[in-house]
């Protein structure tokens, strides 16, 4: 039993304020020898469960059928809007050169000003010759290809290209202004990290926000029940930031590590349950199944990235026996 418990929540995530953008920001990328985009994005459709053969070598149920909860993420193809080349400086990574495509969708004009010039890829190659160390692409989603998300404005984000700089640049230039599908980025059975903005809960009190204990009947008689018993000592003459208080709860960017991508599907109707996913509907394009839950509500943008600290566990290979498509409406 824990005797000292001033709060249940972690102070590591303070200040608990709303995320700056609903498009999550990825600040670190793992090294990769394969020339490909190291991340992708999709929209959360809902959850279901699958029956699969347990392929973890040291698992007690190895070789047996197990039921695994999965999240369904619809992943329409993404388009490459620009190629960026970065160089290392004493102030961190800085853009050495940038080239935008002139073959972009009109819907992107609602998000940013579209370029009019022809792309000049020679300055990208010159930047690499001058010591640039990393290649990234500016990509955007195509929500107008799906029906579960009621918007047409794309979400713009940046992804790193793996491999050495020369090969990564050639690959990025070949994809400029073209589509990239999720099957070109990830393989079935891959270990990934999931980054998203959590469900927003609004302004909540300290009991729900921090899990502090409610006060006893003596305090309740003076209408003081769901609050903190003490704001701190007389000295210092201010309330410390560690004191659990009311405030914003939810709508924070969070990263969940080491999820397993167990299926990449082309036909969305094969995974759509009877009656469609609640508050989402029918899946129209490509989709992926990710083990466990992911942050955020239905329709939330979910970013996926190569696992930055993958587990040492060994997996034989994904073998799915059954995918549940029963109605999620409770009937």
Curated annotation (Swiss-Prot):
UniProt-listed SUPFAM superfamilies: Translation proteins
Keywords in alphabetical order: Ribonucleoprotein, Ribosomal protein, RNA-binding, rRNA-binding
Signal sequence residues: none
GO cellular component: cytosolic large ribosomal subunit
InterPro entries, per database record: L3_arc_euk, Ribosomal_L3_dom_3_arc_sf, Ribosomal_uL3, Ribosomal_uL3_arc, Ribosomal_uL3_CS, Transl_B-barrel_sf
An example Gene Ontology molecular-function term: rRNA binding
An annotated GO BP: translation
Annotated PROSITE patterns: RIBOSOMAL_L3
Keyword NAD: no
A Pfam family annotated for this UniProt entry: Ribosomal_L3
The family this protein is said to belong to: Belongs to the universal ribosomal protein uL3 family.
Function: One of the primary rRNA binding proteins, it binds directly near the 3'-end of the 23S rRNA, where it nucleates assembly of the 50S subunit.
Subunit annotation: Part of the 50S ribosomal subunit. Forms a cluster with proteins L14 and L24e.
UniProt xrefs under NCBIfam families: L3_arch, PRK04231.1
Name used for this protein in its record: Large ribosomal subunit protein uL3
Encoding gene (name): rpl3
